């Protein structure tokens, strides 16, 4: 492995660690935002989008430009994809360990129930604001509770399947970002 390839991978790991910490912090902030802070149904929907889409994309763009600059301002499609994939994979691992394992299992073990309660309350508020009948609201809430109950049944196989799908998605995203940031 030549020096530039090595530098790209090391930079990908460093950027991935930072991106993973940022995404983990944003995920935790989003959780507290929707379960404790916001009472507005609009903010319940908009908050997670801002925390999980817009801010992370801004960070990814910053890290991609920074990585390209660190190797002289030029990298091929392969180099861009390799560096970005490494960054995304490390960020995913940090976020998975930090949020999905440590935070969800030890800090907020009842987080899923709190999030579901907040989602049900936001949905009920939206339906009430639209003037829906109480019978329709109760039916929608019952459907949501049924969907949540089905999501509770996770197995090791479904967890592994989710990880594999995430890694494939990360690779596709790295290809897209690699094509955008090659120069």
What are these regions (language model features)?
Residues 1-70:
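Transmembrane alpha-helical insertion/packing segments
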Residues 10-18, 82-91, 161:
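Alpha-helical transmembrane segments of multi-pass membrane proteins
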Residues 22-30, 55-56, 91-95, 99, ...:
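Alpha-helical transmembrane segments of multipass membrane proteins
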Residues 68-69, 77-78, 82-100:
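Hydrophobic secretory-pathway targeting helix
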Residues 69, 172-183:
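Juxtamembrane interface at the cytosolic side of transmembrane helices
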Residues 96-130:
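Functional transmembrane-helix hotspots
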Residues 128-150:
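Low-complexity, acidic polar-rich segments
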Residues 142-168:
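Individual transmembrane alpha-helix segments
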